[in-house]
């Protein structure tokens, strides 16, 4: 270990002890929670590859609303639909902020995106643009040709590898990346491979453990240990690529409205004005990064889980294939066909319930002191909503941890944010605005995979032997990538 690192850790340890010893002991009526260790509080209890499961297990012991002390950060975790409703509906305005983090400030241009921007007029207007212009149902439909073209390419690859194992995980990640990049940037990104590589480094950074995040007074560690310099270098790489994209869009002129990519839309909004603030290139880049980072990992992980569950349940695979092959006429699936694929939609719903792409929703922050379920929640408290625990709540779902798509037959519950037992995209003001786009990246590819190919496990593996161990980053995915064998449809 370098001498500077040793000295830094020694200084940090001393300061941590000082923070702990001198910090005022609260007398507020906080929610119950597990015992706190000196200095670190409950940080050690989140050091797990599946923190959503750890928190659900703690909630069984300490209650559906639970207080954790994560270093210097007071944190409240809610784990049931009733308490999620309290946070995201009853008191939504009080919990509409995001915590300020060094990484969101660096990567998203001082948090001028939609995901990390603080609640206020800027966020409201940018969210409105996103909802009405960028990710409306009409706009998502306009990208259908991009999805269709990419699925044709993938199908040809699978045909050439029929009868041999393919890495389904890698294939779907590449597919989702290609569609999102083209829908967002058009054909103007000359270095997509570098862009995607840096984006994944950003995603890893956002989900990685960082001691200074739990001790605001230790931000100097990010400088001394070289983390901040590394993050700034990554941000500079992204900024250079996005700057070239904006220049390319401006040089080629404006596309027709039905051919606009998302950068076209944002530049049009920037040029026409009409907002209470001047839209800058930094605002455009921040929102573009939102689009690129938010959907990539989550859509591919959902596809991976859906196919995994179908491989583990051959009777469900058979029913889904029979449906899609009876509905589709000819060699090509149209997105209109999806409206008739009722069982496939049940499969996607059940996948989102049991394998929520973001099991712990993006953290919120309490804007003003309030009371939830009889407990005091001080201002600046960090709020974690365990969407996975809500989706597997035994009081809301029978056989909650079993994969049963049929549970959604004739069931009015949906993922639009009104039913708090099923919130894979969040709810309230901070619900994911890319919901429709994300679903299009799951339903249409899945239908194609089931229509054109039969599938089997490699090396004589039995369905019940398929390893479904989880690992959590930005989203929860399989620890071991899914490898399966495509067989040409007879």
UniProtKB/Swiss-Prot annotation:
Involved in the biosynthesis of germacrene-derived sesquiterpene lactones. Component of the parthenolide biosynthetic pathway; parthenolide and conjugates are promising anti-cancer drugs highly active against colon cancer cells. Hydroxylates germacrene A acid to 6-alpha-hydroxy-germacrne A acid, a precursor of sesquiterpene lactones that spontaneously undergoes a lactonization which yields costunolide. Its EC number is 1.14.14.150. It is a single-pass type II membrane protein. It comes from Lactuca sativa. CDD domains: CYP71-like. Keywords: Glycoprotein, Heme, Iron, Membrane, Metal-binding, Monooxygenase, Oxidoreductase, Signal-anchor, Transmembrane, Transmembrane helix. Its main location: membrane. It is found in: Membrane. It is an enzyme of class 1 (oxidoreductase). GO terms for cellular component: membrane. One of its GO terms (molecular function) is iron ion binding. Heme binds at residue 432. Glycans are attached at residues 167, 255. It catalyses: germacra-1(10),4,11(13)-trien-12-oate + reduced [NADPH--hemoprotein reductase] + O2 = (+)-costunolide + oxidized [NADPH--hemoprotein reductase] + 2 H2O. Belongs to the cytochrome P450 family. The chain crosses the membrane at residues 3-23. This is Costunolide synthase. Pathway: Secondary metabolite biosynthesis; terpenoid biosynthesis. Pfam families: p450. Its cofactor is heme. GO terms for biological process: sesquiterpene biosynthetic process; terpenoid biosynthetic process.
């Amino acid at each position: 270990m370098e001498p500077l690192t040793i000295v830094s850790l020694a200084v940090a340890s001393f300061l941590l002890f000082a923070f702990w010893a001198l910090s005022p002991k609260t007398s507020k009526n906080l929610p119950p929670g597990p015992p706190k260790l000196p200095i670190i509080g409950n940080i050690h209890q989140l050091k797990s590859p599946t923190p959503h499961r750890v928190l659900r297990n703690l909630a069984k012991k300490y209650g559906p609303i639970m207080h954790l002390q994560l270093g210097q950060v007071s944190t409240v975790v809610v784990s049931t639909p009733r308490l999620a409703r309290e946070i995201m509906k009853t008191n939504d305005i009080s919990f509409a902020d995001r915590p300020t983090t060094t990484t969101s400030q660096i990567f998203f241009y001082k948090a001028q995106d939609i995901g990390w921007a603080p609640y206020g007029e800027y966020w409201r207007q940018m969210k409105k643009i996103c909802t009405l212009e960028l990710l409306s149902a009409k706009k998502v439909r306009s990208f259908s040709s991009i999805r269709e073209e990419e699925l044709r390419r993938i199908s040809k690859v699978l045909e050439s590898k029929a009868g041999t194992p393919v890495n389904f995980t890698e294939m779907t990640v590449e597919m989702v990346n290609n569609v999102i990049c083209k829908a967002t940037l058009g054909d103007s990104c000359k270095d997509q491979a570098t862009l995607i590589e840096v984006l994944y480094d950003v995603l890893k950074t956002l989900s990685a453990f960082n001691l200074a995040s739990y001790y605001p007074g230790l931000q100097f560690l990010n400088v001394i240990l070289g983390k901040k310099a590394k993050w700034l270098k990554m941000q500079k790489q992204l900024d250079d690529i996005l700057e070239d994209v904006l220049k390319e869009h401006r040089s080629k002129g404006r596309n027709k409205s039905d051919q606009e990519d998302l950068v076209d839309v944002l530049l049009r909004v920037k040029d026409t004005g009409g907002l209470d603030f001047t839209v800058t290139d930094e605002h455009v880049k921040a929102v573009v990064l939102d689009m690129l980072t938010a959907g990539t990992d989550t859509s591919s992980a959902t596809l991976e889980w859906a196919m995994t569950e179908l491989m583990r349940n051959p009777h469900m695979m058979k029913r889904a294939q029979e449906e899609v092959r009876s509905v589709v006429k000819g060699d090509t699936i149209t997105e209109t066909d999806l409206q008739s694929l009722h069982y496939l939609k049940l499969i996607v719903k059940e996948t989102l319930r049991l394998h929520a792409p973001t099991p712990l929703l993006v953290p919120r922050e309490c804007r003003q002191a309030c009371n939830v379920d009889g407990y005091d929640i001080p201002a600046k408290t960090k709020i974690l909503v365990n969407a996975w625990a809500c989706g597997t709540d035994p009081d809301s779902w029978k056989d909650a941890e079993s994969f049963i798509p049929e549970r959604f037959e004739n069931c009015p519950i949906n993922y639009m944010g009104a039913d708090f037992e099923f919130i894979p995209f969040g709810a309230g003001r901070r619900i994911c605005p890319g919901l429709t786009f994300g679903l299009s990246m799951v339903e249409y590819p899945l239908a194609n995979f089931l229509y054109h190919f039969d599938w089997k496990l490699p090396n004589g593996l039995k369905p019940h032997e398929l390893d479904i161990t989880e690992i959590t980053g930005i989203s929860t995915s399989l620890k071991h990538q899914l490898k399966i064998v495509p067989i040409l449809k007879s």
